[in-house]
Amino acid sequence: MPKFALLVDLKAKLGKESEVEAFLEKEATLVRGEPGTLSWHAAKVEGEPGVYKIFDTFNDEVAREAHLKGEAGQELAANAGKLFSVTPKVYRLQVVAQK
């Protein structure tokens, strides 16, 4: 069972929603090349225009740090000002239960 996770809150700038979704598709492609990232999901929050979440899981802190410092993390940081109305908020989580 994965023990470590990240939850990222994203708020698209008005009118940038389609660009954000294309960016998230690109991020998914980058993350597929990360052996330590066990799962990665990007989702749009229903009923909250422009609000997105990313949730990903890892077996250990080393893998989580590699992900944050890797290409996907760098791309998120580099594009944050262009795509998002507020700085993305990254929560470091410890998984306590799963199906």
Role assignments for model-derived ranges:
Residues 11-19:
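Short, surface-exposed ligand-recognition loops at beta-strand->loop->(often short) alpha-helix junctions
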Residues 26-38, 57-91:
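An amphipathic, aromatic/His-enriched active-site/gating alpha helix that lines ligand/cofactor pockets
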Residues 43, 91-94:
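Flexible, low-complexity linkers/stalks enriched in Thr/Pro that connect modular domains
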Residues 96-99:
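A short acidic, often aromatic-flanked loop/helix-cap motif at beta-alpha or helix-coil junctions
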